[in-house]
Amino acid sequence: MDKFTLPFPSGVLKNWPNLDDVDIVIRPNYGWVLNILPLESVEESSGVARTRIPASYPMVKVRWGLRDVNSNGTVWVENVLDALDEPGEWVLNTKEQKIYLWPHGEKPEDIEAPQLTELIRVEGAIDYDGPHDEPVRGLTFRGLSFTRGDRWPWEKERAGSTLQHDWEMFDRPTAMVRMRGAENIAFEQCHWFDSGGAGIRMDLHAQSNRVADSVIEHLGGAGIVLAGYGPGTKDVNRYNEISRNHIHHIGEILWHAAAVSVWQSGGNRIAHNLIHDVNYTAITVSGRISWTKEGRGDGWRTIRWKEVEQTGGEALLPKPGYRPDWKLRAPFLHGRNNLVERNEIHDVMQKLWDGDAIYISGTGGGNRVRENFVHDCLSENMCEGIRCDDDQHETIIERNVVLRNGGMGVGIAIKGINHVTNNFIVDSTPFFQHRGMISLEAVPVEGSIIQQNILVATKPGLRPFYLKNLTGPPDPRLGETKMDFNLYWNTTDPKWADAHLAAGRLEGVEQNSGLGEPLFRDPEKGDFRFKAGSPALKLGIEPVDLRKVGLRK
């Protein structure tokens, strides 16, 4: 089935007179994206509709996952009178030039219609195909409010000009504030709220810019987007700072929108933010690209093939069903050396699934995720607290606390060679199949350091570790990692980790790890310092002081 065709049950869709006004809202095939697609035609007799622009994937039920996520619906129709059934809803009929509104009170009040997606653009001279841009420099915006922007619609001719999984458009005016060719620009003590699209984005050439001490709330799209040039040698989106912002209720229209999205952008610092009530992932650092010239998949149009071929030679040319080795692609994946630290994140993954609090995937090395507090993400849709997804390497995940994680109850997952050290994963609360509190879900993992972590379970049946290559054999092995000096405790089963420790020791790892209550001072109140006599101290595990995390100077 193509990406324009939608079969439907009899009577659900109609060939409405104002069909151009009608949208289909759908989770197509996968649970990690939501599309809003205008209808082109409806054949009531055959039960087949077509949309004017393609979906991200074929428009069938969500089919991939550990459980059925279709029961609450995967496709809806919007902007038809048939669906106007509760206060606060409205329908626009452009043929009649009428708005139908069911008001909250006795009469309509404060009706506003946005006219712009962008309110401010800071733009230098962009030479898209050339090696250098001329940025605007040295502006500060302080104490401003931005609101009532519109959502930028998807564009048929720009399919493939997108970030990973179509979570955002590449180089488009989707945010109220946009920097494009900008350096040393600061937005301080500002407020983005009540808008249909994203809050602020930094496109292409964006360096040493700062968004700080601000509030970003109730947006239809993403909170903050950093998106550099596609894979190539032009690496000019970097060294930006996102700090001390309160970001919440994000993705209220486009559910997949992240609070902070970093794509092909490196050396950034994302720190001391408070992020909550997000329908999908809180923070993404990504470089996932369909490495193809065939016109299929995520972001394929963004690849700067002339630069890649001049630098990488034949090894990087696309072949059917082939993705070049990460080490060959890494020089062109500019999402490297980012620092994600001391953020507080809770109540994410409210509607979509297969997402996380912090997500790193398919991008460059040197990213560091440290001293973040991820807690009370108890949505049934939750996957991992922190995840290195497909083909992600050289990431350091250290000194994080993951407390009360729902969904699969997984604290940290890696797919690749990454380091997981001195993290505390406590009180996992899985709603369905539990993989493990730490999961190794792909190969290779040789050389991964997994040391000085504390895993505390309060329920029976949980696993400390899960080792499974989710794309097929061979599976990762404990002995391929440098795994040791970890502490395990289950309040209901003192022998909980015995089998894991025995298996690890047979493979030459976990020689010094052990069982024991870590003696946190007050974990219920977020105090993960140790009491005197904690066995963690003998293992060289350091306490994590959450007083330094979140909205702090």
Q: Residues of each region from the PLM?
A:
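Extracellular beta-strand-rich solenoid/capping regions of secreted or surface-exposed proteins
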Residues: 112-139, 168-183, 202-204
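Extended Gly/Ser/Thr-rich low-complexity repeat segments
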Residues: 10-31, 59-84, 107-125, 136, ...
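N-terminal catalytic cores of secreted or lumenal carbohydrate-active enzymes
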Residues: 156-164, 169-171, 179-181, 194, ...
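Right-handed parallel beta-helix
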Residues: 137-148, 183-194, 207-221, 235-251, ...
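Acidic, glycine- and Ser/Thr-rich low-complexity intrinsically disordered tracts
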Residues: 40-45, 52-59, 64-86, 91, ...
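Short glycine/acidic-rich loop motifs that flank beta-strands on beta-rich extracellular proteins
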Residues: 150-156, 174, 196-202, 220-226, ...
